[in-house]
Amino acid sequence: IHKLLFCEKNKEKVEIGGVFMRQADVEFTVRTDLALEEREKVQGSEIPGIRVREWEKEETGIRVTEVAVCDERGEKALGKPVGMYLTVEAASLAKKDDDYHREVSEELAGLLRGMLKEHGLETEKMGRPVRTLVVGLGNPEATPDALGPKVLEHLQATRHLELEYGTDFCRKHGYPVLSGITPGVMAQTGMETAEILKGVIAETRPDAVLAVDALAARSVRRLGVTIQLSDAGIHPGSGVGNHRNSLTRETLGVPVIAIGVPTVVGAAAIVHDTVGALVAALKEGGEAGYGDMVEHMDGRDQYQLIREVLEPQIGPMYVTPHNIDERVENLSFTISEAIHMALFGGNG
């Protein structure tokens, strides 16, 4: 193992768990966009500035976890901005079951409605329809990244009705003022998404932005079956290490609610998920020395060991389910229906 991990090009090394690593690789993060997964890293302990609640609907198996990052202490501990993070987990989302997807849409719509209410975005309070801009983030040409654009394909926009029939049209019919845009990715447009949205927001003056995006997860079991809703905005590309200008209330001037589904996971994270099984197998096979060595390394060191072995061979690869096209298509309907239910109520 020592020989395998030795790198002549980089003389500076550090010893982790009895194994020498390249110093340059020691600083890293296990990439995930899910606040729930960040919270799970410190499962069982109370974290100052973090509040967690969870509940499950037995009849549907839909599980909801609420992670609230309350202040700077929580922000530092979790690595997530202050805000509310709601995670809907439903294993049956992996199947094509229209009735079940509708149940998830209803649950998500209720959570979205509640989050809008927290920000004072209610027709009753405002005395007029809520003006909402839905943004479909991602690259429509790359299936795992096409969730946002797909949701926009199913969106029932209404803003144009005001332009055609008068500014009172939506209020009279009980409709929200709903518009949408798919800004593409920087490689296609040459512009940051935030730059595009600032122009659109200045012209259309929405009360809120709903940003839909594909996310990265740490665990394979969450791919395509987990939906995260957050009022902390969104940071395009952060889950795969591709940092872009953030889309937040501070940068755009209106509340930004993010809806995301993990569609990719890092190859090293997949291997990390199997370390426990590997350790057990090594011990059972009489290789207790190697098993004990890996077992006694903490999760961070295990992950670093895996990256040290894996990435020189294949690079920082990301993996997606084989039927991701079908999953993205189904989930795009689920999310678009949730948006319609939350904003139209019984008038959609």
Give residue spans per PLM region.
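Short glycine-rich or small-residue beta-strand-to-loop segments that form or flank ligand, phosphate
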Residues: 87-91, 131-142, 180-184
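Glycine-rich phosphate/diphosphate-binding loop of Rossmann-like nucleotide-binding domains
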Residues: 139-176, 180
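Polybasic, lysine-rich low-complexity intrinsically disordered segments
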Residues: 9-13
